[in-house]
Amino acid sequence: MQSLNLPNAITLARIALVPVVVLTMLDARRGGSPALPAALVVVAALSDALAGYLARRTDEVTEFGRIVDPIADKALITGALTVLAVQNRVAVWVAVAIVGRELAVTALRSVAGRRGITVSVSRLGKNKTTLQVVAIVTLILAPDPYAWWVLILVYAALALTLVSGAEYFAGLRSRPGGEAGPPERSSSPGG
């Protein structure tokens, strides 16, 4: 299997989209439309699903894709949350907690990978990413980012983020014989 196939090209395009998302988010707070960065976040999320689907459907799941796809997810989430925190559209502590979890799981995967252990993506991890994207799009578009319904969504995303992070660490500690990961295993990108 070659590394630069269509699913991996889509993932690389998603990474290239991150600075565009950040710049359009910054512009939206200076009078630009928040619809554009919100739409770009949705496009990035849908491209993630498309890349994973194509990789599995065409049997083009590569080691490159397994490594780079979660990095693309984390770059998007981190970039968007950083801008939202700077713009005071989300509490800094919430952004730090979510980004901190993302970095911790990335570090866990890196250390485990060097030891020959695969940390697979769980269904909870995929759901976490989806809820994060919904929360980010809502924070971009909401006239009042501190409205009760927005806060419920943000705190739900935070809770799922922390629970899924704990699941990865617990899964690594409980797996004998070099296999690690959460209870539900998946070969698809994300997490």
Q: Which residues does each predicted region cover?
A:
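Cytoplasmic-side transmembrane-helix entry/capping segments in multi-pass membrane proteins
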Residues: 68-72, 96-97, 122-129
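Membrane-interface helix caps of multi-pass small-molecule transporters
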Residues: 53-57, 111, 141
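Membrane-helix boundary/interface segments in integral membrane proteins
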Residues: 101-117
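C-terminal membrane-associated helical module and adjoining short loops/tails
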Residues: 1-7, 12-13, 17-18, 37-45, ...
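Active-site His/Glu-centered metal-binding helix of metallohydrolases
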Residues: 16, 46-50, 54, 71, ...
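Membrane-embedded alpha-helical segments that form the functional core of polytopic membrane enzymes
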Residues: 17-64, 80-96, 149-162
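Alpha-helical membrane-protein architecture signal
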Residues: 36-39, 64, 68, 104, ...
